[in-house]
Swiss-Prot record:
InterPro entries hit by this protein: Znf_C2H2_sf, Znf_C2H2_type
Compositional bias segments (type: Basic and acidic residues): 18-32
PROSITE patterns for the chain: ZINC_FINGER_C2H2_1, ZINC_FINGER_C2H2_2
Organism of provenance: Homo sapiens
Family designation: Belongs to the krueppel C2H2-type zinc-finger protein family.
Domain of life where this protein originates: Eukaryota
Region entry Disordered, spans: 1-42, 55-90, 120-209
Any one GO molecular function term: DNA binding
Protein name: Krueppel-like factor 2
């Protein structure tokens, strides 16, 4: 039963120095070991309690709701960046998440990174040139035809705000390029995009948007303009060029009139008339008239010089035709058969048989 009693003496025994010296001689090794162990245990307990309190504080803090995912064409406001709030937790939680303090690269400026629900992301302010990032430049909107945005009311106004001040739900269309910053055209005073095909992401225009009348077509019918000018007593507008494509160069060359050449043969008047009594024939050439007069006079100046032939003719073509009889030359040949003729009129009669 002596071993079941408490090992440490009571506080009343420390009043007597003799008793204290006896106790030290009785337990020479217990006191230094117990003192060193208590210090180590106290330091470990303090560290565990501090970590436990930090963990309990981090767990007790309510988690903020996750931010809504940004739309595909959302551009962060240059004048009012979202406030940065320190993450909940103590020193250990801050050291375990060093990526929050890492600086963002130039390609990530102006973007919102999607993080788990328990994290809060710090958004850096965009660059001055407005490039890099999926968003619409100030003054540019994506909506129906004619939707334009004039000067922004303030730096805190967003280009994709709805009537209630909240951003519309993200459209179904993906971003322009997921693997690189998108380059948008420089913002101007009035700019509009072509009309989309429609979808749930395109709602009613915001307060800074209005419908502009469609631009008149560059080319069209001019009957209405001429009628309106005539009704107002003004001169009709000058005729504009045709919308048809230009003709080919060959057609243009053929359409031009050729100088020095007549498109149709000019009928020559018969000025040469036979003066013989009772004959009123006329000819266009004087040679023809001379040959005709030989029929009246009986003159035959063209003689055949073939041996034994004394034929005479009033015309040279008649002598040539006669001379072919002696030589057997037949220059007129039928292209449908093998027959040939010495006279062209004989060939014409032969061709009628093939028809």
């Amino acid at each position: 039963m002596a071993l079941s009693e408490p090992i440490l003496p009571s506080f009343s025994t420390f009043a007597s120095p003799c008793r204290e010296r006896g106790l030290q001689e009785r337990w020479p090794r217990a006191e230094p070991e117990s003192g060193g162990t208590d210090d180590d245990l106290n330091s470990v307990l303090d560290f565990i309690l501090s970590m436990g309190l930090d963990g309990l504080g981090a767990e007790a803090a309510p988690e903020p709701p996750p931010p809504p995912p940004p739309p595909a064409f959302y551009y962060p406001e240059p004048g009012a960046p979202p406030p940065y709030s320190a993450p909940a937790g103590g020193l250990v939680s801050e050291l375990l998440r060093p990526e929050l303090d890492a600086p963002l690269g130039p390609a990530l400026h102006g973007r919102f990174l999607l993080a788990p629900p328990g994290r809060l992301v710090k958004a850096e302010p965009p660059e001055a040139d407005g490039g890099g990032g999926y968003g619409c430049a100030p003054g540019l909107t994506r909506g129906p035809r004619g939707l334009k945005r004039e000067g922004a009311p303030g730096p805190a106004a967003s280009c994709m705000r709805g009537p209630g001040g909240r951003p519309p739900p993200p459209p179904d269309t993906p971003p322009l390029s997921p693997d690189g910053p998108a380059r948008l055209p420089a913002p101007g005073p009035r700019a509009s995009f072509p009309p989309p095909f429609g979808g749930p992401g395109f709602g009613a225009p915001g307060p800074g948007l209005h419908y502009a009348p469609p631009a008149p077509p560059a080319f069209g019918l001019f009957d209405d303009a001429a009628a309106a000018a005539a009704a107002l007593g003004l001169a009709p507008p000058a005729a504009r060029g045709l919308l048809t494509p230009p003709a080919s160069p060959l057609e243009l060359l053929e359409a031009k009139p050729k100088r020095g050449r007549r498109s149709w043969p000019r009928k020559r008047t018969a000025t040469h008339t036979c003066s013989y009594a009772g004959c009123g024939k006329t000819y266009t050439k004087s040679s023809h008239l001379k040959a005709h007069l030989r029929t009246h006079t009986g003159e035959k100046p063209y003689h055949c010089n073939w041996d034994g032939c004394g034929w005479k003719f009033a015309r040279s073509d008649e002598l040539t035709r006669h001379y072919r009889k002696h030589t057997g030359h037949r220059p007129f040949q039928c292209h449908l058969c093998d027959r040939a003729f010495s006279r062209s009129d004989h060939l014409a009669l032969h061709m009628k048989r093939h028809m």
